[in-house]
Amino acid sequence: MLIPSKLSRPVRLDHTVVRERLLAKLSGANNFRLALVTSPAGYGKTTLVSQWAAGKNELGWYSLDEGDNQQERFASYLIAAIQQATGGHCSTSEAMAQKRQYASLTSLFAQLFIELAQWHRPLYLVIDDYHLITNPVIHDAMRFFLRHQPENFTLVVLSRNLPQLGIANLRVRDQLLEIGSQQLAFNHQEAKQFFDRRLSSPIEAAESSRMCDDVAGWATALQLIALSARQNHTSAHHSARRLAGINASHLSDYLVDEVLDNVDVSTRHFLLKSAILRSMNDALIVRVTGEENGQMRLEEIERQGLFLQRMDDTGEWFSYHPLFGSFLRQRCQWELAAELPEIHRAAAESWMEQGFPSEAIHHALAAGDAQMLRDILLNHAWGLFNHSELALLEESLKALPWESLLENPRLVLLQAWLMQSQHRYSEVNTLLARAEQEIKGVMDGTLHAEFNALRAQVAINDGNPEEAERLAKLALDELPLAWFYSRIVATSVHGEVLHCKGDLSQSLSLMQQTEQMARHHDVWHYALWSLIQQSEIQFAQGFLQAAWETQERAFQLIKEQHLEQLPMHEFLVRIRAQLLWAWARLDEAEASARSGIAVLSTFQPQQQLQCLTLLVQCSLARGDLDNARSQLNRLENLLGNGRYHCDWISNADKVRVIYWQLTGDKKSAANWLRHTPKPAFANNHFLQGQWRNIARAQILLGEFEPAEIVLEELNENARSLRLMSDLNRNLLLLNQLYWQSGRKNDAQRVLLDALQLANRTGFISHFVIEGEAMAQQLRQLIQLNTLPEMEQHRAQRILREINQHHRHKFAHFDEGFVERLLNHPDVPELIRTSPLTQREWQVLGLIYSGYSNEQIAGELAVAATTIKTHIRNLYQKLGVAHRQDAVQHAQQLLKMMGYGV
C-alpha cells in the first residue's frame, strides 16, 4: 500500500514569493531530458518547483525518504507517480511494479517506455530529495531511464548534491537544464517581497537588501529572521546579524535559541514527538503526541511558520522541511530519549491501523520492540514476502532474537523461504534442522509438513529428485487443504520428480492439479511453472500440437498477469523455440530464442546457455556452419564457466556433437567421448538426450556396435515410458548407423518407422539435420512410390528443407567446384570433351537434390521450357537417358571429389 502523501505535490502557500525569474527559466524544461535543481538544504528547491508545477495536469510528483533505497519500493512509487500524470495510461507497468513481476528496474523501465510510446503530449516527473538515494542499482537504472525516456518526457530532479545520473554527458549534449544554489538564492527584490509578506510592519528596501546580503540569499535564514522577529518582537536586523555567515552545520544552536526556546513547552514537545514521522496526518498525530485534534494542531503549527508543509491538495498529509525535521529528530533523541521507544511504538500502532505495515516495521525497529516487531511479522510478513519486500523482511528477522523465532516457528519458515528465494539452498536445510532440534515441545504436524514442502523444493532445485519426492509426499500427507501455498509447492515438486522419472501421465496429472490450485489462489508463478511443465511433458509424449496449445495458455497467463519479466518467461519462449525448430520454422525459432536472451539480459550470461544452444541448432539446421562455429565458441566458453543442470549440458553437447558430425571432426568427438560421464539411467528426456549424444559420437568414430547397443536400449526405455519424441529421435540416429555401416534394409526399415511416428510429432528438422545421407534415402523412397500419403508428403517436405539448407555443401556445382572437378585426373573423358555450361551444372545439382522441373525453374527464375532444354542438353553431354541416371552420375562425381555421399 502506497502512502498518498509521497505522491502529492506540495501545496503552494499564499505568502510564498513567486520566483518569476526562475519560473521563466523552468518554463523551457520541456526542451530538456533532465531539469536538475541542486542546492544545500533550505534554498527553496521544493517551493520553486511546486510553483512551476501548479496548473500542470500531466505531471507526477514523487517525494523520497530513506526507505526508498529499496529498489522495489522505488519502482512502485515512481510508476505510481507516472500513472497519476498520465491518468492510468501505463497499466501494464503498474501491475508489474505492484506485483514485483520484473527482472530488474531497467527491464521495468523498458516496459514503461513501450507504453509511453503511445503518449504524445508533454509529460513530467518530479523526484524530490534525490540525495537520499544511495543504492547504486537505482542510480544505474535512472541513468538508463534518462538515456531511453521518450522525447516528450522531462525528468525533474531536486537534490542537495549532484546526483550520479551521467550529468556531464547530458550537459555536453545540451539535454540538461540546471538551477543551482547561486540562482536559488534570493535577490534583493525577492527578499523585500518575502519580508513584506511575513512581517507586520514593513522594512526599508535598503535594510532588506542588507539582510539578504548578510545571509547570502539563503531562504531558510530569511524565514528564521522573520520567525524570530515575530516571536521575540525584536528587529529583523538583529536576527540577521546573528545569522550572517551561518551554514547548515551550525544551524542547530540557532534553531534551539531562536525557535525551540521561544515556543511553549506543549508546542516544543509536539514538534519533537511528531518529527519522528516522515509524513503525518491527523490519526498519526493524535496517537504519537496525545493531542486531541491532530489536524487542528498541524494547521496551527503551519500558521506559526514552523517549517511544516502540506503534502497534498486535501491538506490531510503534512511533513516538516527536511532541514528542520532532521534537527528536530536529533533534539528528540537528546531531550526525549527515555520516551522515544514509546513514541515509536505509538507511531507503529497508528501506521498499522491505517494499513501500512512497512512503515509500522520501520518504527518497531526504531523502538527496539522485538515483541511488537514479531506481532507485525506474524500478521503481515507473508503479504510482504509475496510483494517482494525481501530486504525489509530480512532486516526485521535479523532484529528478532533466535528464541523469538523458535517460539513462532512460522517466522523460521519465512526466514527459510527468504533463503530459498536467494538460492541459498544449504542454509535452508541447516536453518530448518536447527529449528526442529531446538523447538521446545512437540512440533506441530502442519508446520512440520510446511518445512518438508520447502525442503522438497530445495531438493529438486539442488538436483536431488529422490529426496524431493520423499519430502513432497510427506508434506502432502500431513498438510490440511487450507494450507494452499505449501500444498501447491509440494504438488508441483512431486509432479516434477515424476517427470524426471519418466512417469509422464502421472506427472502431467499433478501439474494440471498444480495449475488449478495456483490459479484458484492467485499464485501466478506456480501457475506459469505448471503450464511450462505440462508443455514439456506433452512434447516428450510426442503430442507437439497439444504442447503448442498449452504454451498458448501460458503466454496468455503472462499477458494477463504481467509476468513478462519473470525468468520463467525465458523458459516458455525457449520451449516454444524448441517446438518451432522441430517443425522447421527456423526464423520463428531463432526469434523466440533471441527473445529468451532478452528476458535474461540483466542476469548472468550463464543463464543464456539454453537459448544460445537453440541459436546454434538453427544455424546447423540451415547448414550455416560458419555461424554455428561462432556461436559454439561462445557456448563452450559459458560451459567452462558455470555449473549446469544435466538437461542444459545434454542440449549443449547435442549441438557440439552434431557440428563435429557435419564437419567430420573425429578428434573433438573422441576427446569428448573419453571425458563425458555416462548416465546411470535413460528414463527421462534429459538422460535419453545425453545417451543419444554418446551414440552419435560413436557413430562418427565408426564404433557401430556399441552405438547400436546404446540406441536399442534407449528405444526399449522410450517405448516402455512412452517417450515418443525421444523414440523418434533415436530411430533417426539408428537409421544413420545402419546406413553408414552398409545395412541398407535395416536403415530403410527404421526410417519408415521414424516417418510414421513423425505423423504424430510433426518432426522435420530432426530429419533435415542428418543432411545428404537422409536426402539420398528419401529420394529412393519417393521414387519407389510406396509411401503412404502422409509419409510421402512429409518426405517431400524434408527433402525440400535439406535441398534449401544443405545443398551448398553437397550438390551446388558452383564455378570453383566445377574448375576443381575438370582439373581432377579421374574426371570422365566425356565431360572433358563436351563440357557443361555453368547453367547446366546448376541444373544437374538441383536434379541431384531432388528438385522437380517446376522447382528448378522456380529456383533459377526461368521458364519451365528453358529448363527442359537445359536438361536435354546435359543428358546428351553426360550420355544418360533418365533422371535417375543423372542423379547417379552426379553422385559418382561428388564421391570422386571426396564428398561422403
UniProtKB/Swiss-Prot annotation:
InterPro entries: P-loop_NTPase, Sig_transdc_resp-reg_C-effctor, TPR-like_helical_dom_sf, TPR_MalT, Tscrpt_reg_HTH_MalT, Tscrpt_reg_LuxR_C, WH-like_DNA-bd_sf. GO terms for molecular function: ATP binding; DNA binding; DNA-binding transcription factor activity. Monomer in solution. Oligomerizes to an active state in the presence of the positive effectors ATP and maltotriose. HAMAP family: HTH_type_MalT (MF_01247). Transmembrane segments: none annotated. This is HTH-type transcriptional regulator MalT. Keywords: Activator, ATP-binding, Carbohydrate metabolism, DNA-binding, Nucleotide-binding, Transcription, Transcription regulation. Residues 829-894 form the HTH luxR-type domain. NCBIfam families: PRK04841.1. It comes from Salmonella paratyphi B (strain ATCC BAA-1250 / SPB7). Residues 853-872 bind DNA. Belongs to the MalT family. It comes from the Bacteria. PROSITE patterns: HTH_LUXR_1, HTH_LUXR_2. GO terms for biological process: positive regulation of carbohydrate metabolic process; positive regulation of DNA-templated transcription. Pfam families: GerE (PF00196), TPR_MalT (PF17874).
